[in-house]
Amino acid sequence: MAEQQGREPECPVCWNPFNNTFHTPKVLDCCHSFCVECLAHISLVTPTRRRLLCPLCRHPTVLASGQPVTDLPTDTAVLTLLRLEPHHVILEGHQLCLKDQPKSRYFLRQPRVYTLDLGPEPASQAGQPQDVGPSTRPVPIRSRYSLRECFRNPHFRIFAYMMAVILCGTVLFIFSIFCTRRFFWGVG
């Protein structure tokens, strides 16, 4: 993977810059790195599911029985260079899935599941023609949290406290203008 200085590392197949989602760099046995999306596409069209040929040098990488390409080792050197934390991307059928985890347990927001469609299922190819372009769409997960959970959120608490302080300050300011005006000018 020859990189020019000043450029972000990119996948040599699709030329997209590496990231920690669907373009996570994965290392093959030959030490070449490719994004997980390209490797998933290659593994789905390869006749032998257990052997994955490197697109650059054609060196085979043997996968364990039932092991998806998402379980290949991540190129942590590239992620460290990009200052990114690795995310766990899984391959389910013809879709790459990423579950977005909240950073803090105090910040209660809905986790999202992002999927990347890698093409039609082999059984559905005989039916209606489908759009084979990859699409990334967030799928919100339903929540059972109530308004009570919203009040436990520290960001909401800080916002509510600041609004209360601003309201009290405004009321005191208006009251002080009334009292000062009455006291000095005798207007009433």
UniProtKB/Swiss-Prot annotation:
SUPFAM superfamilies assigned: RING/U-box
CDD domains in alphabetical order: RING-HC_RNF183-like
GO MF, one annotated term: zinc ion binding
CC per GO annotation: cis-Golgi network membrane; endoplasmic reticulum membrane; lysosomal membrane
GO BP terms, alphabetized: apoptotic process; positive regulation of endoplasmic reticulum stress-induced intrinsic apoptotic signaling pathway; protein autoubiquitination; protein polyubiquitination; protein ubiquitination; response to endoplasmic reticulum stress
Annotated localization: Endoplasmic reticulum membrane; Endoplasmic reticulum; Golgi apparatus, cis-Golgi network membrane; Lysosome
Subunit structure: Interacts with FATE1. Interacts with SEC16A. Interacts with BCL2L1.
Protein name from the UniProt record: E3 ubiquitin-protein ligase RNF183
Lineage: Eukaryota, Metazoa, Chordata, Craniata, Vertebrata
